[in-house]
Regions:
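N-terminal leader/auxiliary helical segments
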Residues: 1-86, 94-256
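Aromatic-lined, polymer-binding surfaces characteristic
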Residues: 91
Length: 256
């Protein structure tokens, strides 16, 4: 993570800097680009309440360095659809690898819990974008894939199957809609039953708080830095796919 809106917003802002060919491909396969922006996060939604081998793939892939992960997945980007998913996936890595060290630092020093800070940053971005009641924003509309698109995505995440990918995406959309339900007291009560702070903290705060002002501003600096960093990462990926040139130190960090 960051949370879902930050990744989706980040991907939309990247589009203007894409080359014309990539923009045309994204228009053709927009669902793949949009879901690529969420990267391996989709596996966290497979079954959030029970540990499963498929659900744990989210942690497995997030722990891999960019060099390890992208050296492997570039082999799946030969098709137009595969490249479009890769373009979104690179956006996920670019934002995660810059923001996660900061989020983990704030969690370690007791300033904020991991998911709590990410949910607040989503609220901050939505408010900045003119959404009057950010906690009511339903961002699930783009969370969908066709069966064929699930086949494309599964190739990036062995041993996940297309059926696994379909379940992850469908559950992600359901969870997103549930979190913005009109009866927040009922939603909060159900979340508390999980006894998992990471799940409870996904409920976006209704209002900002002074304790977040500095952290939101620092997260925004990292977010903007990631926007500037993306073209260089894409250039390295393209060179790697053309010539086999090893990925450089920019890909050394893990997703986080």
């Amino acid at each position: 993570m960051p949370a879902n809106y930050a990744h989706y917003r980040f991907g939309k802002q990247l589009l203007s800097g894409m080359c014309p060919n990539d923009r045309r491909s994204i228009q053709r396969f927009r669902r793949l680009y949009d879901m690529g922006l969420h990267g391996p996060d989709i596996f966290f939604y497979y079954n959030p309440l029970i540990k499963t081998a498929t659900g744990q793939l989210g942690g497995v892939f997030h722990a891999q360095s960019g060099q390890e992960f992208f050296t492997r997945v570039c082999a799946q980007a030969g098709s137009e659809a595969g490249r479009v998913y890769l373009l979104g996936l690179l956006g996920h890595y670019c934002l995660d690898s810059l923001c996660h060290p900061y989020v983990e630092k704030k969690e370690a020093d007791g300033s904020a819990r991991h998911v709590e800070l990410e949910s607040e940053f989503d609220r901050y971005l939505l408010e900045s974008d003119g959404v009057v009641l950010p906690h009511t924003y339903d961002g699930s509309a783009h969370m969908r894939l066709t069966r064929g698109e699930c086949v494309t995505v599964a190739l990036f995440y062995p041993p996940a199957t297309p059926a696994n990918i379909n379940a992850c995406v469908r559950n992600m959309a359901r969870a997103t809609r549930f979190l913005v339900g009109k009866n927040r007291k009922h939603v909060r009560r159900l979340l508390r039953l999980t006894r998992s702070p990471a799940i409870e903290d996904q409920l976006m705060p209704e209002h900002g708080d002074d304790r977040w002002l500095w952290m939101d501003s620092e997260m925004l600096v990292l977010y903007n830095r990631a926007l500037k960093r993306y073209p260089g990462l894409l250039s390295q990926l393209d060179e790697h796919m053309r010539t086999g040139e090893p990925l450089g130190q920019d890909f050394a960090p893990a997703f986080g």
